[in-house]
Amino acid sequence: MKTLKINFLLVLIILISGCSSVPKNTADGCSIFNERYMWYKHAKKAEKKWGTPVYLQLAIIKMESSFDWLAKPPRQKLFKVVPYKRPSSSFGYSQAVKGTWKQYKEETGNKLAVRTRFKDSVDFIGWYTNKTEKILKVSKKDAFKQYIAYHEGWGNYKNYKNNKKVINLAKRVEKQSNIYKQQLSLSLIHI
């Protein structure tokens, strides 16, 4: 009986770790979807529902979490040594903070959504970019400004020109978005 329990736990651990590992080549959209076909289905569903291009969804996730389902911001340090609290409640693929995630769940009725599930994360990104387009009049095809709104929030968006760090991050997202767009247009998947 004890052996059966141990074997069950080993199989469970292998299954969980196999399903949640980071794709081998996150720089290539085609490679990501060839490795994770269901991710393609989920991203396309979010694109159809919200109008957010798949390549923008991927670029935001790459910047926010590097496709790590358990990603969290690094802990702050006390006296540059002692681990302390995290700077925000960001978590999962989308790095959504608790308050915004709660708002997403309430507004969409997706009460069972979790930040560690790719399906829910791309739907969240679609919802967020859709609201950004409505609130700030930023096109979903404008990766640069969409990412600034995503990173800074709708209220702080207007102040981004004074924040060189955010501008540089947004430029990287824009560049990665264009790379994914080109890759996916040439891919056998045909997005």
Across the structure, where does each feature detected by a protein language model lie?
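Bacterial N-terminal signal peptides that target proteins for export
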Residues: 1-8
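Hydrophobic membrane-insertion alpha-helices, especially the h-region
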Residues: 11-14
